[in-house]
């Protein structure tokens, strides 16, 4: 009896996504010991040793603040505060609001997953909680589809990447590419490296042991290395600080973005054709993945990226099979980024001005499409065992890119409108803290494991009541991290980047 085409496709997709080699128990022990030794070589094993370099750095920041004419003056807290409070007064200020909404949505997503002990421990009550969230007539889809906050970030990232590249688009390609990537690395790497150092070591284990057990215990040396090399979205499973996968995706998309942007700048029609074709191809690949793995009824990928207790390799594989590949790889996730890239190109190349009525019409229609896309997941919640129906397959393939187009439409309506309306300065400040809030919000979410109100929650309303407290604590932590880590290091790296001609 011959195998079905579906079986062949599934086998091919499994082979492409992961090749598993047999290893003896002795080999596994040796690999574990090697990984442990390599990890300990870079991360101290006591809180005192791990905190010493951090305290030394903070001391230098304080010295730079108190002695403004010293060699450490570039680390000054006063300078960092001034930078944080500086207003840009640009038509792109509207992006700050979208960025803030996106991080709140991501926080909401994680509060409703990693914030719950029953989900972390895979207890029976976790399924009841998830059903209660999905079944809510108003907020069910908003909660279940909250991972769409990532698509907002991808649109913004693509838009800003395009504007950054096109400012010097006439420079020699490879010279410009190296400078473009170096600047992005200098933007993302320092804060992320220091956060991983704290999160993967004894400091976080002492403060939040449950975070360490579910987020870090499965890391080993290679898991940590994947984060500092921006390849964590290519891990076989997202069990090592899985929520940081976005940084790897962002860097990889930045690395290939100049190919599209160079073509858009020199041959606009060809560039448009290549970009649109790639977006469509990404949708087709998404449909292929969900069809092959039978996961088209799980479009929202509503599972936490953690290390579950007592799991073996096969259980782990079954939990994330297909979903992780579809959710994190550049070829399945590039659509929203490329849509933002096109919008960024249009904002640079076009001087078009919208009259007020056109701007309002575009914004409102785009908002309606965005809301409709969010709530179009409801048939999956109403029929959770429907499987790979045509509706589920098409929705899984296109909904992230359609949502990205709707977000881009709203941004375009605000950017090209005739009248300029400045946004509230508070959004500019919050937007500057968003990157650190993204890094730090997950440990904050774990603090709420001790909140009985959240653990007993049975409605999305309960999550919405907790969200402001998660956001406030996350942004307070982000402010401290910004003042002592991101801004001072940014001042140093910008000086060296200027000297190197980047």
Swiss-Prot record:
Source organism: Caenorhabditis elegans
GO CC term (a single one): endoplasmic reticulum membrane
Protein name: Regulator of hypoxia-inducible factor 1
Keyword GTP-binding carried by entry: no
Induction text: Induced by hypoxia.
Topology of the protein relative to the lipid bilayer: Multi-pass membrane protein
Source superkingdom: Eukaryota
One of the record's GO molecular function terms: acyltransferase activity, transferring groups other than amino-acyl groups
Gene null: resulting phenotype: Impaired acute acceleration of locomotion speed upon rapid increase in oxygen levels (from 0% to 5-20% oxygen). In double mutants for both rhy-1 and hif-1, normal increase in locomotion speed is restored.
Membrane-traversing stretches: 54-74, 92-112, 138-158, 188-208, 241-261, 272-292, 335-355, 367-387, 396-416, 437-457, 465-485
Alphabetical GO biological process terms: negative regulation of cellular response to hypoxia; response to hypoxia
InterPro entries found in the cross-reference section: Acyl_transf_3_dom (IPR002656), O2_lipid_transport_reg (IPR052728)
Keywords: Endoplasmic reticulum, Membrane, Transmembrane, Transmembrane helix
UniProt subcellular location: Endoplasmic reticulum membrane
Organism lineage: Eukaryota, Metazoa, Ecdysozoa, Nematoda, Chromadorea
UniProt tissue specificity: Expressed in intestine, some sensory neurons in the head, body wall muscles and socket cells.
Chain's role: Involved in the response to variation in environmental oxygen levels by inhibiting hif-1-mediated gene transcription in a vhl-1-independent manner. Plays a role in susceptibility to killing mediated by P.aeruginosa and by pore-forming toxins produced by B.thuringiensis. Probably by preventing hif-1 transcriptional activity, regulates behavioral responses, such as locomotion speed following acute reoxygenation. Plays a role in normal egg-laying probably by regulating spermatogenesis and in body morphogenesis.
